[in-house]
Swiss-Prot record:
Enzyme superclass (EC): transferase
Protein name: Mitogen-activated protein kinase kinae mkk2
Organism: Aspergillus fumigatus (strain ATCC MYA-4609 / CBS 101355 / FGSC A1100 / Af293) (Neosartorya fumigata)
Similarity comment text for this entry: Belongs to the protein kinase superfamily. STE Ser/Thr protein kinase family. MAP kinase kinase subfamily.
Phenotypic consequence of gene deletion: Results in severe sensitivity against cell wall-disturbing compounds congo red or calcofluor white, and drastic alterations of the fungal morphology. Impairs phosphorylation of mpkA.
This enzyme's EC code(s): 2.7.11.24
Role: Mitogen-activated protein kinase kinase; part of the cell wall integrity (CWI) signaling pathway composed of pkcA, the bck1-mkk2-mpka MAPK cascade and the downstream rlmA transcription regulator. The CWI signaling pathway regulates cell wall integrity and pyomelanin formation. CWI also controls oxidative stress response, gliotoxin production, iron adaptation and asexual development. Finally, CWI is constitutively required for A.fumigatus to cope with the temperature increase found in the mammalian lung environment, during infection.
Key words of the record: ATP-binding, Kinase, Nucleotide-binding, Transferase, Virulence
Length: 503
């Protein structure tokens, strides 16, 4: 018997909104989980007996917890021999650089305060290429020597073969000479810009010193993101350099699959201009659209620093943008796989865009526990336990993201208690799988009230049974979404208030 769909069309229940200042007194931090170890199944085997008089088995009366098995969502766990990468002269290639997680910059700190930031003029002017699941990583398992991560899950979950896809990337550093960009500029009669370069062109721009750095956007153990432009070009772009060390064949597949993303054309998807692999350093560089408003993660932390709270109407526009982006990606047969606050960007005009569909999640598991943990916090229960990963898993991650931004804290555990500092990741993942889902609650002490439809939207996103969880396009028909679509919100003014821009 098939499961009934989630009842999204429940009549909306109006909620009250309080007026006046709402100074939050919450602390942020993705806490570890309670200081307790997961309970293993403790079935007792048959009792020992003499051969002539065997005794019956005595099963344990203790119930076994849900099975938390190792996950291989998109890949294979079989070992595949790795070939030693070699240079053009036949000698073995030097090992790539070691890893180092990407922390976003959260500058522009000010001491002013806000009430609800809803776009109004109130307030001051202003990756996993691993074959293991989150649980196996938390238990200390590592990839066996000689095994190769499955390239099919290297960047985004492209779940159909694309005609000519293998031809999308030429091995530009071995099979041919790089283009002379000065000559190409003369032929075009104008300076080159981001749309003029393919992957060979981007590698040539790097080697011919045509990429001008304008400032750092963040750096850490996994790499760095820099604001750049091409020499004599007009477009400012973000260059993300990833220094982690997956298998070389996977790196090539990553560059190929980024070209799938390059063909995406949606106002809700951060545009990818190109990517290239530098074999001398073992890094992958990704040129992408620069979104000046920053990530939702940096925005809500800045709002918290200012003593405010992101308003429900702003959250509605953010949710609408994410759902539209996920719907578009699904039409391209792509699953994002890594929805979280740091992968939701806002432009200066307030446009919401998705970035990193798979990039940070895939690289995050390789030698950087903090990055991996940060990603796995937003995983749907089915992904934690190794079940198939679908587009509705991204809807779960959206629910966790909205709940975190609304409450200014990570929503697990649901009661908001502080967790023990030495509790392990496996405890938290087990908690997410086994315990009731968190709910959005009003905060009378801070005079903060959320609408009943918003609370119901979060509840629908955090449906634990995948068949009952709605798709992104179905969630766009939710009563809360229909209500939010009719709201007038100046998202550009909201971003301007957060960062204190005067123009």
């Amino acid at each position: 018997m098939s499961s009934s769909p989630v009842p999204l069309l429940r009549p909306p229940v109006p909620g009250n909104r309080g007026n006046g200042p709402r100074p939050p007194k919450l602390t942020l931090g993705i806490p570890p989980s309670p200081n307790s170890r997961p309970v293993d199944g403790n079935g007792v085997g048959p009792a020992a007996a003499a051969p002539e008089a065997p005794q019956p088995q005595r099963p344990s009366t203790r119930p076994a917890p849900p099975q938390l098995r190792l996950a291989t969502p998109m890949g294979s766990s079989s070992d595949v021999p790795q070939e030693v990468p070699r240079l053009a002269n036949g000698r073995p290639a030097p090992p790539p650089l070691a890893t180092t997680g990407l922390n976003e910059s959260t500058g522009h700190s000010r001491s002013s305060s806000f009430t609800y930031l809803d776009g109004k003029a109130s307030g001051p002017a202003s990756a996993s290429s691993s074959n293991y699941s989150a649980l196996s990583f938390a238990m200390g398992l590592r990839q066996p020597h000689g095994s190769t991560p499955d390239p099919s899950s290297a960047i985004s979950s492209v779940y159909s073969d694309r005609e000519g896809g293998v031809q999308m990337e030429r091995d530009n550093s071995v099979n041919g000479l790089l283009p002379d960009l000065d000559k190409l500029s003369l032929e075009k009669g104008r300076p080159l810009d981001v749309d003029d370069l393919d992957d060979e062109g981007w590698l040539a721009a790097s080697e011919q010193k045509k990429i001008i750095e304008l400032g750092s956007l963040g750096e850490g153990a996994g790499g760095a993101v820099t604001r750049c432009k091409l020499k004599d070009g007009k477009t400012v772009f973000a260059l993300k350099i990833i220094t982690t060390d997956p298998n070389p064949d996977v790196k090539k597949q990553i560059v190929r699959e980024l070209n799938f993303n390059k063909d995406c054309a949606s106002e809700h998807i951060c545009r990818y201009y190109g990517a290239f692999m530098d074999k001398s350093t073992g890094t992958i560089s990704i040129a992408m659209e620069f979104c000046e408003g920053g990530s939702l993660d940096s925005i809500y932390k800045e709002v918290k620093k200012l003593g405010g709270r992101t308003g429900e109407k702003v959250l509605g526009k953010i949710a609408e943008g994410v759902l539209n982006g996920l719907t578009y990606l699904h039409s391209r047969k792509i699953i994002h796989r890594d929805i979280k606050p740091s992968n939701i960007l806002l432009c200066r005009n307030g446009q919401v865009k998705l970035c990193d569909f798979g990039v940070s999640g895939e690289f995050g598991t390789k030698g950087d526990a903090n990055t991996f943990i940060g990603t796995s916090y937003y995983m749907a229960p089915e992904r934690i336990t190794g079940q198939s990963y679908t587009i509705t898993s991204d809807v779960w991650s959206l629910g966790v993201t909205l709940l975190e931004v609304a409450q200014h804290r990570f929503p697990f555990p649901a009661d908001g208690t502080e967790m023990q500092p030495r509790a392990g990741l496996i405890d938290l993942l087990t908690y997410i799988v086994r315990q009731p889902i968190p709910k959005l609650k009003d905060e009378p002490e801070n005079r903060i009230r959320w609408s009943d439809n918003f609370k119901y939207f979060i509840e629908c996103c955090l449906e634990k049974e995948p068949p009952r969880r709605a798709t992104p396009w179905r969630m766009l028909e939710h009563p809360w979404m229909l209500d939010m679509k009719n709201k007038k919100v100046n998202m550009a003014n909201f971003v301007r208030q957060v960062w204190g821009w005067q123009d």
